[in-house]
Amino acid sequence: MVKIRKDLVSSSVIKNASYGYGNPKSHIVIHETANQKPGADAAAHARLQKGGNSRAASWHYTVDDKEIVQSFPDDVKCWHSGSAYNSKSIGIEICVNSDGRIRV
């Protein structure tokens, strides 16, 4: 089983890239990164979030075929699925390999 590695963003990133705390976690939303560049793994996407990612998007976990990285605490309301679900869901991004395949 793959372990979850916590690499949490700072409080300033939480303030600037989320709706803050209070997520009741009633849903799970899964997306793919759509990033097929070499090296675009879970660790790279976690680093993107720690830097305050310029996409105005945030999510809780990034998954690749080697690891799972948690970037935001579960009770934070991340920006990943529109206003209807941001406030009540855990966001997961699945990395895409350079051949376009998803392996988890």
Feature names for model-found ranges:
Residues 1-83:
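N-terminal catalytic cores of peptidoglycan-degrading enzymes
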Residues 55, 88-104:
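Long, well-ordered alpha-helical scaffolding segments within enzyme catalytic domains
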